[in-house]
């Protein structure tokens, strides 16, 4: 059940009505309804996945309590590592086993040995990377005594399985979401209205921007061997806006839906393509994942407290693990490695920005220097996105190579569909809207909000009529 589907358009109002008019007696009935709705939502992909979600929920609920109750450090460590190993074990089996089996077989073959890997015919459960990280952060925080264990199973189950964030984030923290589900929510008209605005803007990003760019990005990447330089450059740009519109659109919808139920989720995107360097980009892009790796991997490794080489080592570890988190393919690992390389000049010059607000708070007309920094950062991310999108490392390298070897800057035709100036104009308008609204979480809100909403709905209907591309990219992670 996708957020941009008719099924969800029917599902959401039903849950909303039941939540506020039938199950609104107390927080327990509200939470119970949301859990049932979440389990139904998740089972729409494959009901068998539900067993793994329930098991993971019970595992971390039980081990969290045992960690808190244990009187000895040995006992605390036992329950802590049990949760860590089982969670990562399931993630490894479903997501990475075949990748490692094939990689080792290829390595042995390269040395002249015959190897036939034993592969598992497993379907990757939707959202496993996200809800596994929810549970891991909860158990880690209990072990380090940052939070108390949650003894109410219903409340904890909702924290893990809450349907807006279940399959593609944001990756929530127990310190942020659990206190909200432990109290009864009261309906607030203004909050609900903001939620509707944010849902509509998320659909604009997904249906109008991402799905339209996907048509051309897919055609270019699938036929890159016959494309000229201009087409390949456009293909990388189209994919950059496809993945941004797709993922940030999903996050906007998730945040908006949560506001309808009186819950506040972590913001996941903060206009990342207006970043002036790669460090700022990663403070604005997939914020919940970046902060998760910072708090649970980078800082425990020593963070930035050590010398230069420790900072470099930790940065490379973080980005390679981040690439690996995204998928079991060498292209994702190379993508992470490239982003780590982008960090090197900042680490060597000790100019890693901590303040991400200055470019947002200042003028509508920026200086040439700031504009150059923004464009340079965007182009660097586009180069990295080529590896993220390509099927193999070889495809990515050849794609980039053809940009410099097949220098032709004319429009090309794709499957009898021409590149149209309207798409580039649409992206340009989208960028201007983002820039003009960079201080807002919901760009539709504010003055003339009803007019903006009407125009947004018309755009969704118009583009949705001609778009067959439905699935959100991050569902595969």
Where do the protein language model's features map onto the residues?
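Membrane-embedded transmembrane alpha-helical bundles that form the catalytic cores
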Residues: 1-429, 435-476
């Amino acid at each position: 059940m996708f957020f941009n589907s008719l099924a969800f358009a029917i599902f959401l109002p039903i849950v909303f009505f039941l939540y506020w008019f039938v199950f609104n007696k107390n927080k327990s009935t509200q939470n119970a309804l949301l859990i049932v709705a979440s389990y139904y939502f998740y089972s729409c992909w494959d009901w068998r996945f539900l067993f793994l979600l329930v098991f993971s929920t019970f595992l971390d609920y039980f081990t969290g309590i045992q960690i808190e109750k244990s009187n000895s450090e040995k006992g605390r460590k036992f329950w802590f590592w049990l949760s860590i190993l089982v969670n990562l074990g399931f993630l490894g089996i479903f997501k990475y086993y075949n990748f490692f089996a094939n990689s080792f077989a290829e390595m042995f073959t390269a040395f002249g040995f015959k190897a036939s890997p034993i592969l598992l015919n497993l379907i990757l459960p939707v959202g496993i990377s996200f809800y596994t990280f929810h549970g891991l952060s909860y158990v880690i925080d209990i072990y380090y005594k940052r939070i108390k264990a949650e003894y109410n199973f219903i409340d904890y189950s909702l924290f893990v399985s809450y349907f807006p964030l279940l399959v593609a984030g944001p990756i929530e923290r127990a310190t942020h979401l659990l206190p909200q589900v432990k109290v009864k929510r009261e309906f607030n008209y203004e909050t609900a209205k903001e939620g509707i605005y944010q849902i509509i803007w998320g659909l604009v990003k997904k249906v109008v921007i991402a799905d339209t760019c996907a048509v051309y990005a897919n055609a270019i990447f699938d036929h890159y061997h016959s494309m000229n330089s201009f087409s390949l450059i456009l293909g990388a740009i189209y994919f950059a806006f496809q993945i941004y519109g797709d993922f940030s659109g999903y996050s906007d919808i998730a945040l908006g839906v949560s506001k309808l139920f009186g819950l506040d989720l972590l913001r996941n995107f903060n206009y990342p393509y207006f970043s002036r360097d790669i460090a700022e980009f990663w403070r604005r892009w997939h914020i919940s994942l970046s902060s998760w790796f910072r708090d649970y991997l980078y800082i425990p490794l020593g963070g930035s407290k050590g010398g230069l080489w420790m900072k470099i080592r930790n940065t490379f570890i973080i980005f390679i693990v981040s690439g690996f988190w995204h998928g079991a393919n060498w292209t994702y690992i190379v993508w992470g490695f490239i982003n780590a390389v982008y960090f090197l000049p900042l680490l060597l010059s000790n100019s890693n920005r901590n303040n991400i607000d200055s470019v947002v708070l200042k003028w509508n007309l920026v200086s040439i220097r700031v504009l150059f920094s923004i464009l340079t950062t965007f182009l660097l991310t586009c180069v990295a996105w080529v590896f993220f999108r390509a099927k193999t490392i070889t495809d990515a390298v050849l794609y980039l190579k053809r940009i410099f070897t097949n220098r032709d800057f004319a429009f090309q035709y794709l499957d009898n569909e021409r590149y149209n100036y309207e798409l580039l104009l649409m992206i340009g308008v989208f960028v201007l809207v983002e820039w003009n609204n960079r201080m807002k979480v919901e760009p539709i809100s504010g003055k003339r909000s009803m007019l903006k909403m009407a125009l947004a709905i018309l755009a969704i209907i118009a583009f949705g009529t001609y778009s067959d591309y439905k699935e959100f990219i991050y569902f595969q992670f």
